[in-house]
Amino acid sequence: MRPLAIVGPTGTGKSDLALAVAGLLSAEIAVEVVNADAMQLYRGMDIGTAKLTVVERHGVPHHQLDVLDVTETATVARYQQAAAADVEAIAARGALPVIVGGSMLYVQSLLDQWSFPATDPRVRTRWERRLAEIGVAALHHELADVDAAAAASILPTDGRRIVRALEVVELTGQPFAASAPTIGAPRWGTVIVGLDWDTTVLDERLARRTDLMFERGLVDEVVGLLGVGLREGVTAARALGYAQVLADLDAGGDGSAAREPTFVGTRRYVRRQRSWFRRDHRITWLDGAAGGSAALADKVIRIWRDVS
């Protein structure tokens, strides 16, 4: 049985669509979801990641949720190994694995059997020290000097990925992209469906989504996570919403001023997601406005059946 993947930008309704698919298939086959959202890996990061609550999951098993403490570093390599094991275990018990998420590298690592270059802690530490010394913007310029393509694909604010790219270039003598997978037949023959909306409509959805996060207590969630080490987290503290709230709190605010930069940052991230996923010719795209969740789920199932 071929797995199903539902991918696309943030805020498009992928999680709800997966549940609707599970509901329509419930009389025929069990469905289990494998999360492909990097920040939903973290325990306690619920409101700012729009993570479904246990009640909202309606009894559908979800994997790769709440598997890391905020002090732990999320890595694509670790996720790839753990999520692949989940997919294969789900299929082995006769259920349908449905991979759901929009974290671009995580999705690709799972579907394209990405091989990751080795890491050297000494080299990594040296570049991390360099980052601390000169700052993320200057280090991004240094990456551009040795690997212009990598610099063009990595945000100049993403210090962790800049360090990793410089580490790979130094260790392999090759461009960072040389370690990336080429798009071929997806692993396990996975059927990939993309969900998107018109840009104007999605921007409105993102604004409502951001407002709702702050209304539901994102600031309190961040404050609570500070007590368990959020500030020490390499990846968790940089998550959209969390980073903006932290910055406002550090500036003496109460966190409420983080709403607008969170929305702007999310909208910018969505543009990157859309550009990334639209390059993948294997994805069959659906318009989120083309019917309710049941109608969209029916389309997804028909696409899956046609290929399977």
Curated annotation (Swiss-Prot):
Keyword annotations of the record: ATP-binding, Magnesium, Nucleotide-binding, Transferase, tRNA processing
Record's keyword annotation contains Phosphoprotein: no
InterPro entries in alphabetical order: Dimethylallyltransferase, IPT, P-loop_NTPase
Site note Interaction with substrate tRNA, residues: 103, 124
Keyword Transferase (UniProt): yes
Xref: Gene3D superfamilies: 1.10.20.140, P-loop containing nucleotide triphosphate hydrolases
GO molecular function: ATP binding; tRNA dimethylallyltransferase activity
Catalysed transformations (reactions): adenosine(37) in tRNA + dimethylallyl diphosphate = N(6)-dimethylallyladenosine(37) in tRNA + diphosphate
Binding site for ATP: 8-15
Enzyme Commission code: 2.5.1.75
Biological process, per Gene Ontology: tRNA modification
Cofactor(s) required, per the database record: Mg(2+)
Superkingdom, taxonomy of origin: Bacteria
SUPFAM superfamilies associated with the record: P-loop containing nucleoside triphosphate hydrolases (SSF52540)
PANTHER family attached to this UniProt entry: TRNA DIMETHYLALLYLTRANSFERASE
Task performed by this protein: Catalyzes the transfer of a dimethylallyl group onto the adenine at position 37 in tRNAs that read codons beginning with uridine, leading to the formation of N6-(dimethylallyl)adenosine (i(6)A).
Record-stated family: Belongs to the IPP transferase family.
Subunit structure: Monomer.
Protein name (Swiss-Prot/TrEMBL): tRNA dimethylallyltransferase
Organism: Mycolicibacterium vanbaalenii (strain DSM 7251 / JCM 13017 / BCRC 16820 / KCTC 9966 / NRRL B-24157 / PYR-1) (Mycobacterium vanbaalenii)
Gene behind the chain: miaA
